[in-house]
Swiss-Prot record:
Protein's name in the database: Indole-3-glycerol phosphate synthase
Family, similarity comment: Belongs to the TrpC family.
GO biological process: L-tryptophan biosynthetic process
Organism of this sequence: Delftia acidovorans (strain DSM 14801 / SPH-1)
Catalysed transformations (reactions): 1-(2-carboxyphenylamino)-1-deoxy-D-ribulose 5-phosphate + H(+) = (1S,2R)-1-C-(indol-3-yl)glycerol 3-phosphate + CO2 + H2O
EC category name: lyase
Gene this protein is translated from: trpC
Length: 267
């Protein structure tokens, strides 16, 4: 685990402890289990791909540790609606990803709630899961999918959190950065496997990471390439290789109209 990732995960452990003092585990679980049906995250991606389009998970992200503030004019509901509309001709996001980490990414649970309420798209809670409590918390706030980062968790933790998520009708996106993590991720049941092109130690980005690891991903899994997709050439390289699902944030967040930027990149 890289130094920054360890630092983030250590903070998450503290945040979970504080959250459980405000709302005990049993109460959070009860709240999560009482929520209405989720939106079909995997189905939304597959529907776009079946229609010959890219399945885009469009990210709502204000800032990051490596780049600082990415978008000053930050209104999550408007951004979400822009992604859902796209170019108005069918090229639009399949799903949303919303950063809820406050300390490192200037995210918020409220941003997720606002984004989800403003459109019909399924929503991924983008945060750093270190405890089962957070899975229940994610459903309680309205998330349709959770992110499990292999570098943050051991096999038993991933399996437990996946089981809880699936019991709540949530999808799971498991994120890997190298071959060893991919091997571990493939032991899970989820069809969603994300390959992050960002090296968590150097923060360098190379889309070759996805292309190199793709050959080890079974055909029945839905491979999502994450980070570093910023040009039509990047998209073409991935789609030519048979990769049709993308998680993109920064390239859209820097545009005046994020949805139009999405449509232009994936037209």
């Amino acid at each position: 685990m890289s130094d920054i990732l360890k630092q983030i995960c250590d903070v998450k452990v503290q945040e979970v402890a504080a959250a459980q003092k405000r709302m005990p585990f049993a109460d959070m679980r009860r709240d999560a289990e009482s929520r209405v049906l989720t939106r079909d995250f995997v189905g939304a991606l597959r529907a776009k791909i079946a229609a010959g389009q890219a399945g885009v998970i469009a990210e709502i992200k204000k800032a990051s540790p490596s780049k600082g503030v990415i978008r000053e004019d930050f209104i999550p509901a408007d951004i979400a609606q822009s992604y859902a509309d796209g170019d108005g001709k069918g090229v639009s996001a399949a799903c949303l990803s919303v950063l809820t980490d406050k300390q490192f990414f200037q995210g918020s649970v409220d941003y997720l709630k606002q984004a989800r309420a403003s459109c019909h798209l399924p929503v991924l809670r983008k945060d750093f899961m270190v405890d089962p409590y957070q899975i229940y918390e994610s459903r309680a706030m309205g998330a349709d999918c959770v992110l499990l980062i292999a570098a943050c968790l051991d096999d038993a933790q991933m399996a437990e959190m996946e089981q809880i998520a699936h019991s709540l009708d949530m999808a799971v996106l498991v994120e890997v950065h190298d071959g060893a993590e991919l091997d571990r991720a493939l032991r899970l049941k989820t069809p969603l496997v994300g390959i992050n092109n960002r090296n968590l130690r150097s923060f360098e980005v190379s889309i070759q990471t996805t292309l190199d690891l793709q050959k080890n991903v079974p055909a029945d899994r839905l491979l999502v390439t994450e980070s570093g997709i910023g040009s039509r050439e990047d998209v073409k390289a991935m789609r030519d290789a048979g990769i049709h699902s993308f998680l993109v944030g920064e390239a859209f967040m820097r545009a005046k109209e994020p949805g139009e930027a999405l449509a232009k990149l994936f037209a």
